[in-house]
Design a protein with these regions (language model features):
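Short alpha-helical "packing" element that flanks the helix-turn-helix/winged-helix DNA-binding module
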Residues: 8-12, 64
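Residues within the DNA-recognition helix of helix-turn-helix
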Residues: 28, 35-38
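The DNA-contacting recognition helix of HTH DNA-binding domains
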Residues: 3, 29-30
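A short LG(V/I)-centered, amphipathic sequence patch enriched
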Residues: 40-57
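Short helix-boundary/capping micro-motifs
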Residues: 11-26
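Helix-turn-helix DNA-binding elements, focusing on the entry/boundary residues of the two helices
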Residues: 17-18, 36, 50
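Short helix-coil-helix linker/hinge
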Residues: 1-4, 19, 58
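Alpha-helical linker/hinge and terminal dimerization helices associated
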Residues: 42-43, 64-72
């Protein structure tokens, strides 16, 4: 896990949009997805699910977010 992964995770939770995170961070959407996938592989659980409204954080992501938010 690295700072970029934490920053992308945090921004994705806050915005609910890979597109917005990519625009804010001046990265491609594919790049954001790759960072999220690498992060999920590193921590061993899924952070988001896709639904008709966009990305939905998993229950594990909500718990993890509380830990991450304390570090920012």
């Amino acid at each position: 896990m690295n700072f970029l992964q934490l920053e992308v995770f945090r921004e994705t939770i806050c915005t609910g949009s890979i597109k917005r995170v990519a625009e804010q961070m001046n990265l491609s959407e594919r790049g954001i997805v790759d960072v999220i996938n690498d992060h999920e592989r590193d921590i061993g659980f899924s952070l988001f699910t896709q639904n008709d409204k966009g990305l939905e954080p998993t229950s594990e992501a909500h718990r993890f977010y509380k830990t991450v938010e304390n570090k920012f």
